[in-house]
Structure formats: C-alpha cells, structure tokens
C-alpha cells in the first residue's frame, strides 16, 4: 500500500503504480510469506517423526530459532505480526476454515500438526525472546495450507493476495493524486553519527 502511494505521488500512471505494489507484496516477508510457511510445514512433516510429540517438535523449533535448522534464518514463518500480538482475527477465521476443509479433504492429521506447530512455535518464540513480547499466528500461517488443499499452485498465492488489495490500493492512489499540495513522498534522513573524517580513495 505504501509503495503504491509513493509511486503515485510522482504522478506516474496507474499500471506502474499497481505493478510496484505487486513487486513489494511479492517479498517473502510480506505476500510471499504463506509460501514460506507451507514449505516450512512440509519440511517439519519430514523431520518430525511423531507429529504428536511436543518435545521433539520443540527441540527442532528451537534449533530453527537458533539458526541451526531448516533455512537457518532464525524464523518460524507465520508467527508474529507488527501490529497484532495477542491474536490476528484473520488467522483465527482462516484456522477455523482450514479445519473444516481438512476434514472434508481427509487431511485432519496434517491440520492437527499445523495447529501444534502454531502452539509450540509461539511458545518457543516467546522463550527465545525471554518472554518479553507476546506473539500470535498471522494471516499467512493457515492460508497456504488452505490454498494447497483446494489445489492452487504456489505461483498464484501472491497474485490472489494482490487481487484482494487492488480496490484498496486504487482508493489510496486516488487520494494521493487529489492532494492539493502535490508533494512527492520521500524519506527523511537525520545523521546522528556526527562528522566523519574523509579518506581519499587511493588511501582506502
């Protein structure tokens, strides 16, 4: 959304602005996060021998947080949100829908395992942080599982996300174009390091 507003502030065309928004949404920390979650889920299904063994799962999730397992990023994908901390209402509803669909598709064991990953992932993350900040599952935690159950390929996960946002992006763009000030959005930067001594190129 912010990317659409920034590009719109330059008075570029709608196509370019929406394309920029899609490019921003595509990142694995945003719209592409549900792909990260479902890939992590498949990895955990292979690594954890007993899907009901809480201790075995906790050990592996802790190794992930310590950058010793899976992709070694120190992340449990789908856990945590910048705004929602106690619960993400979108994730709560998707969790319910995922349960109904899993029952219909005969994938209840996987659903129960995913719920356990959510439960223990939150616990392990809080312990890893020293218990200072609450966390919850976000929108991406169950959406990828739902998409997979209805047969959608990963390549269209992000486009579906973008489709749901196009109306909002368009509203933001219209608002941006109608500001009387016609200002370009640019970052503000304040140097807090003080002056540094310049080293000539040939001395570096």
PLM feature spans:
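Non-transmembrane, aqueous-exposed alpha-helical and coiled segments at domain scale
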Residues: 1-204
């Amino acid at each position: 959304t912010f990317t659409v507003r920034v590009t719109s502030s330059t008075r570029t065309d709608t196509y370019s602005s929406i394309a920029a928004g899609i490019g921003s949404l595509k990142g694995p920390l945003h719209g592409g996060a549900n792909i990260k979650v479902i890939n992590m889920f498949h990895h955990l299904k292979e690594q954890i021998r007993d899907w009901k063994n809480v201790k075995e799962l906790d050990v592996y999730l802790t190794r992930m947080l310590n950058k010793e397992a899976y992709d070694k990023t120190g992340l449990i994908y789908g856990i945590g949100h910048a705004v929602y901390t106690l619960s993400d209402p979108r994730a709560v509803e998707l969790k319910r829908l995922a349960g109904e669909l899993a029952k219909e598709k005969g994938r209840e064991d996987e659903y129960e395992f995913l719920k356990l990953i959510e439960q223990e992932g939150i616990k392990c993350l809080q312990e890893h942080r020293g218990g200072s900040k609450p966390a919850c599952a976000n929108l991406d935690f169950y959406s990828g599982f739902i998409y997979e159950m209805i047969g959608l390929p990963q390549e269209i996960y992000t486009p579906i996300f973008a489709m749901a946002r196009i109306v909002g992006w368009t509203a933001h763009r219209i608002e941006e174009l109608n500001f009387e000030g016609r200002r370009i959005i640019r970052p503000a930067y304040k140097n807090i390091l003080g002056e540094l001594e310049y080293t000539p190129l040939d001395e570096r």
